[in-house]
């Protein structure tokens, strides 16, 4: 059978579910998530510690966080990548909260920030000691509630459809390899075609 979607997401971890939610909420089209087991089996749930983000600008700032990250990475980290991740972190935290993630808070309503190894300030947001499971819970609920996202559980992507399936020669040196979808093994042991833009 052939299915057509605007977006095809292979994998149901934090990256896959976040991307699906972002494009669906932006009304960019219909999304399908291919999940090899069940939605709640992603490895996101095993992350325990927390998420580092500058949230208290009275005591912390991006430059401190960037410096801490570069030191912890023995200055091997790509400075541009570190800067991007650190400066975008508060926006990502807001998005996770909007999707329903419940980070621990103090009595005054402020985030209950922890300080972990490599950090000079209290900037770790957490949910008890199962932050990954809490993020996954929130993302699953948001995905399941979104009418523009279909989830295919216990489906396995067996091959990505590229231009070589259309007769074009593709080698390691082909400058642009385009993805048109995937061949997916369904729960009846049949291979379906999932096409996307």
Task: Report each predicted region and the residues it spans.
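N-terminal Rossmann-like FAD-binding beta1-loop-alpha1 element of flavoenzymes
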Residues: 7-33
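Core beta-strand elements of the Rossmann-like FAD/NAD(P) dinucleotide-binding domain
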Residues: 2-5, 189-197
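Conserved structured core elements
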Residues: 17, 90, 133, 193-196
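Conserved N-terminal/central alpha/beta ligand/cofactor-binding core
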Residues: 30, 35-187
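Short amphipathic alpha-helices and their capping/turn segments at secondary-structure boundaries
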Residues: 24, 96, 190-191
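A generic local structural motif
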Residues: 18, 186-190
């Amino acid at each position: 059978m052939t299915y057509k979607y605007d977006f095809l997401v292979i994998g149901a971890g934090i990256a896959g579910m976040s991307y699906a939610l972002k494009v669906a909420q932006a009304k960019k089209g219909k999304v399908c998530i291919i999940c090899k087991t069940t939605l709640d089996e992603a490895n996101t749930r095993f992350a325990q510690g927390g998420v580092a983000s500058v949230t208290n600008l009275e005591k912390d700032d991006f430059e401190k966080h960037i410096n801490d990250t570069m030191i912890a990475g023995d200055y091997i980290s790509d400075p541009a990548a570190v800067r991007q991740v650190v400066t975008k972190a508060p926006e990502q935290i807001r998005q996770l909260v909007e999707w329903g993630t419940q980070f621990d808070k103090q009595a005054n309503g402020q985030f209950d920030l922890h300080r972990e190894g490599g950090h000079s300030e209290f900037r770790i947001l957490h949910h008890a000691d199962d932050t990954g499971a809490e993020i996954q819970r929130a993302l699953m609920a948001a995905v399941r509630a979104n009418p523009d996202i279909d989830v295919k559980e216990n489906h396995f992507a067996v091959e990505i459809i590229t231009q070589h399936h259309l007769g074009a020669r593709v080698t390691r040196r082909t400058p642009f390899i385009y993805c048109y979808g995937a061949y997916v093994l369904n729960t009846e042991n049949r291979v379906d075609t999932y096409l996307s833009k």
